[in-house]
Structure formats: structure tokens, C-alpha cells
Amino acid sequence: MTPDTAWAWPWWSAMVAVNIINVIVCLTIFRRTTRSAGGFSNITDQYQKHMLIMGLIFTMVGAYRAVFVSRYLYQFAWFDVLANSSLLIRFFAIFAELSFAGLFAYAMLRFSKDLASNNHTNPALNFIESRSPYLLFFCIFTAQFFATIATINKNNTLFAIEETLWTVGFLLI
């Protein structure tokens, strides 16, 4: 530990501790859900299966990224090891971010189905209920290409496009 980074170790330790708790909670929920169904393959509700998988991916990648912190644009890494490679972490982030978007989109579609309204005369409201979750996922999916290329090329503009796509996706919902 150098004097330049001494301030960051408490922050890093807190982030790792929070993510350890997240992983424990995630695995507990996953285990209880699969055990009560008699195994993962016995879960008949596809919504529950997909949400479990996406939640597990998002939580595990989040924990990995909390341990191996990096800054893509400047290729800064917390540790000088291959596991802290910006490109490797970006690759994992693709799955985590798509899982995150999928969790939101899938939950919104389920709520829209379960809480169906009888008022379909308003086209804007009908669009928000039925199509915006797909557009959210599409925006986040498209953003992944810009983020990955920006990580390789170290291009600020591509990172800005990625963030803009995230913003557009969430403004749509």
C-alpha cells in the first residue's frame, strides 16, 4: 500500500464486504428456490427460471468487479494480475449489464401482464406498457458494442454513446 492509494483501501474493503453479503443472499435465494422445486430443472415457471439466472449472473459479476476494480478508459487496474484485465472485466460486464436490463424488462412485462389495464385508448400508455421493456433491452444490448470497442480503442466518444444509450433506454421506461 502506497500513500497515494491508502485512502482507497477502506472503500475497496467496504465494497467487497457488501458484495460478499450480496453473493450470500443471492445464493441463499437461489438454493431455497431450487430446493423447494426439487432442483432447478423442475422449476416450471419460465419467468422464475429466467429471473434466477439473470439475478445470479448480475450478482456474481458485480462481486467480481468489486474485487477487481478497473477503469476502462485509462486501463487502470486495482491489482496487477490477469484477472484485473479491463477487457476481461468488460467481457463479464456484457453479461451482467444484459442481465440487469433483462431483469428490468422481464419484470415490467410480467407486471404489465399480471396487472393488465382495460384502458388501451391511450396509445402512449399502451406503448409504455407493451414495448418499452423491449426498447430498454435493445438500447442496453447496443450499448455493449460501443463500450467494448471503447475499452479497446480508449475512445471517450464511444463511452459517451454507451452512456447515452443507457439514458435513452431508461427514459423510455
PLM region descriptions:
Residues T5-F40, I173:
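First transmembrane helix
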Residues T5-W7, D80-F95:
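Short aromatic-rich membrane-water interface segments that cap or initiate transmembrane helices
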Residues I24-T34, Y64-L73, R90-P133, F141-I149:
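Internal transmembrane alpha-helix with an interfacial aromatic "cap," most often the third helix
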Residues G38-S41, Q75-S85:
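Perimembrane loop-to-helix junctions flanking transmembrane segments
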Residues F40-I57, T121-F137:
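Membrane-interfacial loop-to-transmembrane alpha-helix junctions, especially the N-terminal start
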Residues Q48-Y74:
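A generic, lipid-embedded transmembrane alpha helix
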